[in-house]
Amino acid sequence: MSEQGKCPVTGRTAVNPVTTGGMSNRDWWPNQLHLDMLHQHSSLTNPMGEEFRYKEEFKKLDLKSVKKDLYALMTDSQEWWPADYGHYGGLFIRMAWHSAGTYRTSDGRGGGGTGNQRFAPLNSWPDNANLDKARRLLWPIKQKYGRKLSWADLMILAGNCALESMGFKTFGFGGGRVDIWEPEEDIYWGKEVEWLGSNRYSGERDLENPLAAVQMGLIYVNPEGPDGNPDPVAAGRDIRETFARMAMNDEETVALVAGGHTFGKCHGVGDPKLIGPEPEAAEIEEQGLGWKSGYGSGKGDETMTSGLEGAWTPDPIHWDMGYLGMLFKYEWELTKSPAGAWQWKPKDVAEEDLAPAAHDPSKRVPTMMTTADLAMRMDPLYGPIARRYYEHPEQFADAFARAWFKLTHRDMGPRSRYLGAEVPAEELIWQDPVPAVDHELIGEGKIKELKKRILASGLSIPELLSTAWASASTFRSSDKRGGANGSRIRLSPQKEWEVNQPEQLQRVLGKLEEIRNAFNGEQSGGKQVSLADLIVLGGCAAVEEAARRAGNDVTVPFIPGRTDASQEQTDVESFAVLEPLADGFRNYTKRKYSVTPEEMLIDRSQLLTLTATEMTVLLGGLRVLGVNFRQSPHGLFTNRPETLTNDFFVNLLDMGTEWKPLSKEHETFEGRDRKTGEVRWSATRVDLIFGSNARLRAIAEVYGSDDAQGKFVQDFVAAWNKVMNLDRFDLS
């Protein structure tokens, strides 16, 4: 082969460019377990450094000054991307909405909490066309405030300021969103291989979980109607399903659609074939901008974005009742935009209900509605809500303010994480509130006393560990929900979940409540312990006792300060999505799924912020301690149960055992002595993956070594403590 054109360092040629690097391991073995999602967003990719604390930097931010600059930007039209109607408000509302609107309740992923709109795939989704310009318009403000203001916060704040600058009173703003510096690898956006593909439905129109959007590359629904079919009633069904999966009820949905579409316009004046590639596919000289249009100037009145064309209201840069007024005042006729997209025009529209041309106020042009907009009138449930809002403007304004706040803050977790002077005082149930600490906390002496009482109560090590794990492991790093604080494991719906073994759970909680009540009754000076703390403390005591039985004297860290939420503070429907479909740490699977149990283990571990090493040591420890669902023997590779040993790894790696599947599905297995044929162990896929997967086996070998017992216990305690405190935002 000729040496010409070959890289002197890598040896790659033009047919093997550095951008692809040839076949990857995942290309060769596409079913290989994806462990990289456990090691995202490390200090190696973060230019801010390990010591950077955004919370502390945000406290130094002059929020009023930032907002003043944002208000000024709204009407500071730039020649390279001029503002519609001389005001960027509509563009920034769309940017903020699309930043937050990727959130879905099923796994808590998506949303505006990380600034992920800056990276692929979101920066190049068809539904985010030309939002790259919105972020470039914000760059001078981001540049000015630097480390004190994250992109994630700035994008949401810009949406708020856009609304406020056009006369709307928002509900508030909480900062604290921390930027990421690389694309998120843990989010499943769908299996389609083409933009706007919709291979995500089964049955009559059952949307695949955990997805919320109807097509690949859309935030919500297709505005032209389901799969481009302009049927407003059918669109209403899609909207209801999609918005419900984004935590919105019907009233919130109508408020968001009607409120958001009060502002701005759509762009579709020319041939969509003239639109250039998205940012990730654009040429290097475009400097990260995409969708360069060859239609006229490609900007201003010649802008191409969605293919729809026109404003919704006669006055697109002021808060008013224009959207609902137009929706109910006119009958609507199906038509097509100049770009060929289905939309609707008002019949016999009055002169005063025409909108100004976006870049020539001397011209008046018709408004429009999308098929999705007409669902707000024609859907049998949305219609009455929309009419009520139309007849009660103050109710509409309040509903939109609250729904917008929920949209832009739903993925931030509890209210205690919000930063800044504009955090609303009102506590909202979707924030999963927990009471403030109103008593003196227990100290080291009382902690030791309570541990002794718990261990003397007759509760077993597996019972204590299972209860503590069930309480804490509901946490999701995605939207910061769940966790042990609040002791919601004693409330509906968690107390009824199959994985929590309700009968055993009630017995354990009853015993712990007896201990708590007796202890609290004996105290003076207001010192108390919450059940939430006692549940975690019981798990810590069990770990210490199990380690002692193995000959290791350890103290598991414990910091009191959790409180007990009430059933009234707990939205049962909202918490239902936290129920584990599978929990590999308890060897539990609710039913058979299209993904493997080991893949679901990785997914849960990622939500618990566990590394592959932490996941491995935790699972191996929990197996020998007997935490399995319904005391299943699978993976119990020890003759010393309830003792914190490294036996799981020692016996898993023993070549004297030969494994065979017990069914053609390869879901459960039997391990027999190679020489005698005697059954030694049974296992699930989740157990055997730690010997099968090369990366996990390498970690298992560390803990299965002869000198590993001490390190195993130390690492198990550290990982256990991490999970128990994932929701302790008061400590971070």
Swiss-Prot record:
Active site: H98
Assigned keywords, A-Z: Heme, Hydrogen peroxide, Iron, Metal-binding, Oxidoreductase, Peroxidase
Protein name from the UniProt record: Catalase-peroxidase
Numbered residues of crosslink Tryptophyl-tyrosyl-methioninium (Tyr-Met) (with W-97): Y220-M246
Gene: katG
Family: Belongs to the peroxidase family. Peroxidase/catalase subfamily.
Covalent cross-link (Tryptophyl-tyrosyl-methioninium (Trp-Tyr) (with M-246)), residues: W97-Y220
Binding, heme b: H261
Gene Ontology terms for molecular function: catalase activity; heme binding; metal ion binding
EC number(s) on file: 1.11.1.21
Broad enzyme group: oxidoreductase
Job of this protein: Bifunctional enzyme with both catalase and broad-spectrum peroxidase activity.
InterPro entries: Catalase_peroxidase, Haem_peroxidase, Haem_peroxidase_sf, Peroxidases_AS, Peroxidases_heam-ligand_BS
Subunit structure: Homodimer or homotetramer.
Keyword presence, Phosphoprotein: no
Organism: Pelodictyon phaeoclathratiforme (strain DSM 5477 / BU-1)
Transmembrane helix is among the record's keywords: no
PTM (free text): Formation of the three residue Trp-Tyr-Met cross-link is important for the catalase, but not the peroxidase activity of the enzyme.
